[in-house]
From Swiss-Prot:
Keyword ATP-binding set for record: no
Keyword Lipoprotein: no
Protein name (Swiss-Prot/TrEMBL): Large ribosomal subunit protein uL30
Species: Flavobacterium johnsoniae (strain ATCC 17061 / DSM 2064 / JCM 8514 / BCRC 14874 / CCUG 350202 / NBRC 14942 / NCIMB 11054 / UW101) (Cytophaga johnsonae)
Biological process annotations from GO: translation
Source species, domain of life: Bacteria
Amino acid sequence: MAKLLVKQVRSKINCPLSQKRGLEALGLRKLGQVVEHESNPAILGMINKVKHLVSVEEAK
């Protein structure tokens, strides 16, 4: 499976609780933080839920 780099680019202030929990589940706590995840359906679903708050790139 491919590796994904997920970076939080927007604040979670004024977001619904489910989106805040999605960011925490991805391991994103601070603005500008980058985490690496395996590409699987669970992770892709979480990313889709908060796609307006994060940027996603494929890791090299």
